[in-house]
Amino acid sequence: MPFRSNNPIMRDELLSRFFPQFHPVTTFNSGLSGGSFLIEHQGQRFVVRQPHDPDAPQSAFLRQYRALSQLPASIAPKPHLYLRDWMVVDYLPGAVKTYLPDTNELAGLLYYLHQQPRFGWRITLLPLLELYWQQSDPARRTVGWLRMLKRLRKAREPRPLRLSPLHMDVHAGNLVHSASGLKLIDWEYAGDGDIALELAAVWVENTEQHRQLVNDYATRAKIYPAQLWRQVRRWFPWLLMLKAGWFEYRWRQTGDQQFIRLADDTWRQLLIKQ
């Protein structure tokens, strides 16, 4: 149920107007981007979410709602309400573990997602890379960073192998191990893009696990594993730049030291992978 309003409302007003019988249960963090809180009534639970990035355009939050509205409940939470600065979605019962599931199981989830109808908007990385450069701390901008940005701008993004709907933030903390199978939460970066971009972006533990995930996916998708792995590797510089830039952007936004540490680590990885 989308509800349009130009005037933001506070949490208590949201609950009293739309969920008068529900009460807050707990607040929990959801990855590095921010948090949500849980409401409950007679055993029924919803997650109340706000935009993770307060500076992001409202259209980005609306796109997340639209993505969830068209995805099957077998892989994503169903949304129940959208209005400015708020979204209410189903709570997915299950375990959120600190490690990825079996690569074959994860490949099955991603392949099923990629068979769904496209969302209708493309993921383009270059505008994000340039935004993060512009919005980062000037003292953190280096000649090397600018050089890599110019190099990618000149090279252009890899041509998609297959264009599909993507989640684009697959890591252990965004995977719910439910009784009916794996499901994904936190769809804020979702959009249409190359399947190899999704596979390249998965937060794996090591190269061996990454190769196995790609091989398992290739089997399902009937693609030569070596061909898919080459395409995944083409995206690596783009994704490392995206991660480093996002950490820099969030550092300036929040002042949280964890983002500086993560940015520095990603810059080191980028130099290694060049």
Curated annotation (Swiss-Prot):
GO molecular function annotation: ATP binding; thiamine kinase activity
Keywords (A to Z) from UniProt: ATP-binding, Kinase, Nucleotide-binding, Transferase
Pathway: Cofactor biosynthesis; thiamine diphosphate biosynthesis; thiamine phosphate from thiamine: step 1/1
Catalytic activity: thiamine + ATP = thiamine phosphate + ADP + H(+)
One GO BP annotation of this record: thiamine diphosphate biosynthetic process
UniProt keyword Transmembrane present: no
SUPFAM superfamilies, alphabetized: Protein kinase-like (PK-like) (SSF56112)
Lineage top rank: taxon: Bacteria
Pfam families reported for this sequence: APH
E.C. designation(s): 2.7.1.89
InterPro entries per the UniProt record, alphabetical: Aminoglycoside_PTrfase, Kinase-like_dom_sf, Thiamine_kinase
Purpose: Catalyzes the ATP-dependent phosphorylation of thiamine to thiamine phosphate. Is involved in thiamine salvage.
Family according to the record: Belongs to the thiamine kinase family.
HAMAP family: Thiamine_kinase
Identification of the protein by name: Thiamine kinase
Gene: thiK
